[in-house]
């Protein structure tokens, strides 16, 4: 921006942020984050001269954090144009959004935005100032992808919008109807221009596979979540550090000695359980999958049901990606001052809608007492709900550390390059793909450089013996790390 007036006009017309004056603070934190994101910066340096994303117009729907700012600026350094919104109403870091806006990138993200604003912002990232169109999506949770597909269906028959099952669906469906009244082909026009999507998280990946199985997916997708250097690092090690940070910021509770229940023992649940045990909580795990349950038991965790644990534990963490894992009845049974939070993507893991009928008392932003009235001879009680059942580590904390996000976002950039450079070929017909293992290993090598790690090099004989090249890949695709 040439002048303050230019910047203010850009922010007023092409952004929705909390406070542009926070941009200097955001820029300083971005500079620190870059020193902790070796993989992402190495990819920026390697590919900047080639401009492999030239011509790409990327709509991004992903938590607008300091680490995401480094991702955005990497995409732009490689030639892309970018517009961004957060994928969660509580996860934005306002100084990060301000710094990105000050750099001339349209961004629509405010911490604590309403659901109406959320879906308005998700629409706006598909609208370009020159009237052009998005041709790539970078998604987290699948909302940007869902919006275009659902809207295009509604163009043919709005009956698909008639029966919302939640407050969020009610607001989303109303937003789609409003847009269709303004432009009856808004969604299909944009949908047909998109060449591909890269999806960040487990929940969004589930949506993609479901859409593909039903024949509804209209463009190819790369499942970034299941790259080893994403799921086994971001999901596990990231949650291991960010969960308890968020709980303690929100409540100042002493974790040691308390009984903590982790619902789900996938990678996110594993990291969450490790974090709570490291602070000397007694950790119980709930699971539906006997393999994951056996893993938990072999790690020394007690495997129980929520029905059993509800009135006994002190801290509850949902980490499943599933629906109503913690129900109204579970919360009704809980102890006074029990803490309930979610580290899965959507708020419906906890039946927040089922307890909205009770009195809510805000303690501070994203920390609420829900007051259950006296009943059946039991006195009034309060439970603590964090981030209104949405992602606790970003609602009540600052999310995962920069270093682990470098792995995830390096995969995102590589996936965007991979899809964009395949446009016009038959390399990626409509479907859901994962990145090849040699790219996974590349990300790991880049990340290792700052950890004083020195890799052993196979001899020719050793490589021949196990049937690999000296340069890798070192494992078969079916290998489970």
UniProtKB/Swiss-Prot annotation:
GO molecular function terms noted in the UniProt entry: adenosylhomocysteinase activity
Residues at which substrate binds: 65, 140, 200, 230, 234
Reactions catalysed according to its record: S-adenosyl-L-homocysteine + H2O = L-homocysteine + adenosine
UniProt key word Ribosomal protein: no
Superkingdom as given in the UniProt entry: Bacteria
Keywords from the named record: Cytoplasm, Hydrolase, NAD, One-carbon metabolism
Entries under SUPFAM superfamilies matching the protein: Formate/glycerate dehydrogenase catalytic domain-like, NAD(P)-binding Rossmann-fold domains
InterPro entries registered for this protein in UniProt: Adenosylhomocyst_ase-like_sf, Adenosylhomocysteinase-like, Ado_hCys_hydrolase_NAD-bd, NAD(P)-bd_dom_sf, S-Ado-L-homoCys_hydrolase_CS
A single GO cellular-component term on record: cytosol
Residues holding NAD(+): 201-203, 235, 264-269, 287, 322, 343-345, 393
Broad EC category: hydrolase
CDD domains per the UniProt record, alphabetical: SAHH
Cofactor dependence: NAD(+)
Transmembrane region(s): none
HAMAP family, A to Z: AdoHcyase
NCBIfam families per the UniProt record, alphabetical: ahcY, PRK05476.2-3
Function: May play a key role in the regulation of the intracellular concentration of adenosylhomocysteine.
Family: Belongs to the adenosylhomocysteinase family.
PANTHER family: ADENOSYLHOMOCYSTEINASE
Name of the protein described by the UniProt record: Adenosylhomocysteinase
The gene coding this protein: ahcY
